[in-house]
From Swiss-Prot:
Co-factor note (free text): Binds 2 zinc ions per subunit.
InterPro entries: P-loop_NTPase, PriA, PriA_3primeBD, PriA_C, PriA_CRR, PriA_helicase
Organism annotation: Deinococcus radiodurans (strain ATCC 13939 / DSM 20539 / JCM 16871 / CCUG 27074 / LMG 4051 / NBRC 15346 / NCIMB 9279 / VKM B-1422 / R1)
Cofactor(s), by name: Zn(2+)
Sequence positions that bind Zn(2+) 2: 654, 657, 672, 675
Protein name per Swiss-Prot or TrEMBL: Probable replication restart protein PriA
Disulfide partners: none
Gene3D superfamilies, per the entry: P-loop containing nucleotide triphosphate hydrolases
Record-stated family: Belongs to the helicase family. PriA subfamily.
Function: Initiates the restart of stalled replication forks, which reloads the replicative helicase on sites other than the origin of replication. Recognizes abandoned replication forks and remodels them to uncover a helicase loading site. Promotes assembly of the primosome at these replication forks. Recognizes and binds DNA at stalled replication forks, also binds single-stranded (ss)DNA.
Subunit and partners: Interacts with DnaB (DR_0549). Component of the replication restart primosome.
Record has ATP-binding as a keyword: yes
Amino acid sequence: MTLWTVSPPAVSSEAEEKPVQDTVSLTAADQTWQVCVPLPIAALDFAAPHGYVGEVPLGCRVAVPWRGGEIRVGLVVGAGSSMGRHRLREALALLDSPEAPWVAPGTARGLTAWAEEAHLPPGLVWDDLLCTGWEPAHRHEVRAVPGADLSPYGETLPDTDWSRADLYPPALLDAAREQGLLDDRFLPDPPQVNRVVARDLNDVPPAARTQVVVTAQPWEAADPALCTPPHWEAVTGEGALTAKQQQAHDWLRAHGPQPSLGAWASGAKVGLPVVRKVADLGWAQEHPQAVPPPPAWKWLREHGPVASPAAWASAAGVRPAEVRRLMEGGAADYTFTPVTPPAAWAWLREHGPAETVSAWATGAGVSPSVAAGLLARGWAAQVQMPAPPPELPAAPLWAGPPLDELTALAADALPEEDRWRLHGGRPASRFAALAPRVARLLAQGRSVLILAPDHATLRRAWAGLGGLAALAGTRAALLSGQLSPRQREEIWRQVRAGDVRLVIGSALALSAPLPDLALLVVLEEGSDAYKLLSGSRAFVPDVAARVARSLRAALGLVGSVPAVESVPLPGLVLAPPRARVHVVDYAQPPAQPELGPLSSVHLTPGDLGYPISHDLARLLRQVQERGRQAALLAPRRGYSALLRCPRCDHVPGCPNCDVPLRFHQDRRQMECHQCGHHQSVPDRCDECGEQMWKARGPGTEWIAAEVEKLLPGFPVYRLDKDHQDDLAPLHAGEAGVVVGTQLLLAQPSPPNLALIGVTLADTWLGVSDFRASERYHRLLRQLAEWHPSRAPLLVVQTFQGDHPALKVLETGRDALAYPAAEERVRAELFYPPHARLAQIEVAARDRDRAKVAAQALADALHGAGAVATEVLGPAHAAVARVRGAYLYQLLLRARNDARLAELLGVLDTRSWGARVRVDVNPRST
């Protein structure tokens, strides 16, 4: 029974101000729970369910009342304040056992704490990062409290017996619930599936398992008129006979008994009245006489039963009338006989149940109509049964050293600190260095979680480390958004049960309830793919670090190159893979001979070739001549970044955003890559009327067209968000060139890859972001190690051939060289890791309104004590207008998290007249 007096749930201000507790232990009478629901709101305070005894069940799911009588599933993330408990609504029921919470309590604490530190509603973050459990398989039932009168609430309401809650209006149930007149319970209701099963033979309807046939009956038991018909015999009578009568009597005496008066008269050649008079005078009497069975009966006795009288007559070669006479006389009759069970039924008995009638038909080798007919006649039935566990990705086999070698202390060269890093080498060598640590922890009975930013990295990690679990006597699970909801639920069940202790997955795996988590590994921690593009816009490595700290688990950062923020950590740097780099420096053509034998001294900037330089063109021709493979990295999708009028330099732009429209030649469309607006290419310039357009900024479509002209007849493929050719021929080893965006790196490397070309590297540098050069360096490292064993020639076309991010790769420096240099620069300029950043975005449909609100926010920050170095801006965003909204930004820089929280607290002091959004640790500034 639930007892409360206030219907709408309210956010507790005390709970917002209170820090997350490490241990939560209150008596049931005092308990309030902080509950997150998957909505962009703060955690809500609810009283514990009526009669609940125990500690606050951190990480457990709970059913809570919601607006309009709706029931929602929430997650207990902390203890609320006991003040004002009597005003709170009670949670309806706890859906998980506190001994097996849906999320590890440490994860619940850590993730919620990170959301509060990031100035984000925890419900929004949980909605992004908890991939299953918000719609649990429970059946909600209600009943009236004994003695309660629910008639004032309506006619259709439950009585004192449990019944399904969905039979009643939710609002009426909620009204009765508020007054303590209703009991709720939630019973496990596992998913059901329809299956086709074979019925037991005795359960098959008699009409289906028997058939009506015509069967010969014993001849002696037939109607006497049929088997012993009366016959007329001559006897001595009294009285005189006429001559005709005497003739008839003499014939009968001579020829024996006759079956009828007619047969007698016919044989004696007299009329029927004559023989009848002889009989009347007593000179003939009727006596029964057995007759032999007719041929038709004998045939049926030997060959029967038959399906019908007509079939009998036809097979026996007699008239239907003869058959009717025998059946009417009881010499044959309809009988029921068991039929031979159909072969399809026997197959289903042995191999069933079948998922569908079609699957049954296919397995039994019959047509679907035959199977459907058997189902209709009752040989099979469609039933609901608990759904079987879904098939999960199979863990790969471990091909490395045995467990005893892996777990030897000498095999583990990684630091023992709480936070460490491992970078350099190729993916295989990094996994080989990580494997001893993972194997040792799994062998100790502890758990390991490995996060990957994208499907390509996830696929490599699963192949390289997934086999360690079986080696250590446990199981591994692959958890990502590519799995179905049922697969994710099954993995969650196995993890909660302790069957799985190694999880390798995407950001969705961060909240997996692994028992006794010892190590949380973040692969490629600097990858922008970890940044959620909507919702909370969380940067997953930041959340992972907070969760690892809350769980007291070690945090390992592993990748091709460390993020600059990771440089201060202790770690291991592997020797870099061999890289062959050739730079085409558009800015310094006379220096080209120094870069390699491919260039010529006479080249000028205009002669170098664009978007495919002469050097790259020569190499592509060699690829064609030798039947090899090449990959070209384009800076953008589509044909070009923009179209420009050659007369007045007018550039068609998006009507909703302050960006040029991208040109897609294959569709003859211009498209905005911010809002999706698209339109056809205008015939003339809107400004001057010029008919000619000039494309600027080559994309994948343009570069692919150039390659096709350069290499006629050679296979050319495209791979970007808009156009994805089938690369199966390349992966099978066939020659060709693929042109794509960074989506290429999500694919396995073609096996015979000989050349990689970066068509314009400056695109990654020409971004107003302090991380631009770091991204550029990471991209070059990833390209250099893309092939798992070979070192394809990497050709970089650029106007900045002496950029340090490129030079360290060209000169063979290790993976730490450039990030370490960048870290020293950031220390001087007060940027991460030596500062904490938060970007505040102010948006409004009116430009002046957005600008005024942004300035007011900056003034408030300065008024609260922020110094000039802590607040940069306001300034309009890099894209000043998106989807009709004008954007202004401020960048906050603080020395630590506490100071950043103080600055962000200013946002809560008033309303700003515009939409304000906070992005802590932004990935683009």
